Regions:
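Oxidative protein folding and maturation machinery
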Residues: 19-192
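Short active-site neighborhood of thiol/selenol oxidoreductases, capturing the structured segment around
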Residues: 197-227, 242-244
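Structural microenvironment flanking redox-active thiols in thiol-disulfide oxidoreductases
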Residues: 223-260, 274-279
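Short, internal strand/loop/helix patches
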Residues: 259-291, 295-296
Length: 320
C-alpha cells in the first residue's frame, strides 16, 4: 500500500513538473474584451453610445495579464491598437465634455493598474499607444482635445520617465491652444494683391481654416476632396461656408506661382507677419492642418482629419 502511494505521488509530481526543468511557461494572451451592451433601460441612441464609452475599458482592466513586447495587459498589439481606435471613434459620437471626462478617467485607470506592479511595462506601453493615436499628426483619429487630459496626467505622473516629462509638458501646452468651443486666435494675412485681411473679418456660417503649402501632395488631395463636394460652391456663394487657405512659411515665390491652382471662390493668403509660427498662435505640427470654425470663429474641429470635416459639413449643410 505504501509502495503504491509513493508511486502515485511520483506520477503526480511528474505531471505537475512536466517539460524541461526550469523552463518558463509561455505567456497567455487574450482577445480584447468588448464591453457589455447597455442595459435595456438605457433606450436613447446617444445614451447607449455614452454608456459604451463609459464602460469600454471595464473588462480590460478587470484582468491581471502579461505586458511584454507582444501584448499590453494580455491583449496582443494589433488587437489593443484596433480597440483603442474603436474607442476614439466612439468618443467622436458623444459630447466633448463626456469625451474628455472619459479620457481623464482612462488615464486614472492606467495609473492605478501600473501601481499594482511598479515594475510592469504596462504604463509605458499603453501611454505610447495613447500618444500614437491621439497626437501623432499622421493618425487618422488624432484629437488634441481628447489627448489633453491624458498628456497633462502623463506630464505629472510618477510613472513617467524623467526624460519624457519636458516633452509631455510641451505637448500639454500646445494642446491647450484653441481648444474645442473657444474662439481661435485672430491674425492678419495678405492676399496675392497685397491687401490685408483678418480671420475674424471672414463672414460665413462655417469657416474651414486650411493651413497649406504649394506643391504639397496631401494639401492637393484635400483641395480635390473638398472640390468634389456636390454643394460646395453653393455653400460658399450663399455664405454658409468660407474656405481660407493660409500659407505660413517664407517661400513666397512658390506660393505666388501656385496661386492659379487654388479655387477662385476660396480665400487665399499668407501670414506676412509670420506670427502663427513664431508666436505659436496655433499648434501647426504638420502641413496640411484643418480647423472647422463656426460663425463666431469658435472651434468645432481642431487639426482634424479631412474626413471628419467633410462629414460634419455634409451633415450640417446637406439640406441647404
Amino acid at each position: 500500500m505504501v509502495k503504491k502511494l509513493i508511486i502515485s505521488t511520483c506520477v503526480l509530481l511528474a505531471a505537475v513538473s512536466c517539460g524541461s526543468p526550469g523552463k518558463p511557461s509561455s505567456p497567455v494572451y487574450r482577445s480584447f474584451p468588448l464591453p457589455d451592451p447597455a442595459p435595456v433601460m438605457v433606450t436613447g441612441e446617444a445614451e447607449r453610445i455614452a454608456y459604451s464609452v463609459n464602460h469600454f475599458w471595464d473588462k480590460y482592466f478587470a484582468e491581471q495579464a502579461v505586458t511584454d513586447s507582444a501584448a499590453v495587459l494580455g491583449v496582443k498589439n494589433d488587437d489593443i491598437e484596433k480597440s483603442f481606435a474603436t474607442y476614439v471613434s466612439l468618443l467622436n459620437l458623444v459630447p466633448m465634455d463626456v469625451a474628455v471626462k472619459s479620457t481623464a478617467d482612462l488615464f486614472r485607470r492606467i495609473e492605478a493598474k501600473q501601481a499594482e506592479n511598479d515594475s510592469s511595462l504596462f504604463y509605458l506601453r499603453f501611454t505610447e499607444i495613447v500618444s500614437k493615436y491621439l497626437y501623432d499628426p499622421n493618425s487618422p483619429v488624432r484629437n488634441e482635445d481628447f489627448y489633453l487630459p491624458m498628456v497633462k496626467g502623463m506630464a505629472a505622473s510618477r510613472f513617467t520617465s524623467e526624460d519624457m516629462v519636458p516633452a509631455y509638458e510641451y505637448e500639454a501646452r500646445m494642446c491647450a491652444l484653441n481648444p474645442y468651443g473657444s474662439k481661435v486666435a485672430d491674425f492678419k494675412f495678405k492676399d496675392i494683391n497685397g491687401r490685408v485681411h483678418s480671420l475674424y473679418g471672414i463672414r460665413a456660417t462655417y469657416t474651414i481654416l486650411f493651413f497649406s503649402n504649394p506643391y504639397c501632395t496631401n494639401c492637393k488631395e484635400i483641395m480635390d476632396n473638398l472640390q468634389s463636394l456636390e454643394n460646395l460652391n453653393w455653400w460658399i456663394s450663399s455664405g454658409d461656408l468660407a474656405v481660407a487657405s493660409i500659407y505660413i512659411d517664407r517661400e513666397l515665390d512658390e506660393w505666388r506661382e501656385y496661386q492659379p491652382n487654388y479655387p477662385k471662390n476660396w480665400i487665399t493668403g499668407y501670414d506676412h507677419n509670420y506670427i502663427i509660427r513664431e508666436d505659436v498662435l496655433y499648434n501647426v505640427r504638420a502641413i496640411p492642418s484643418l480647423y472647422l470654425l463656426d460663425a463666431e470663429k469658435r472651434v468645432i474641429l481642431k487639426d482634424a482629419p479631412q474626413e471628419q470635416v467633410i462629414q460634419y459639413l455634409a451633415r450640417k449643410l446637406q439640406n441647404k
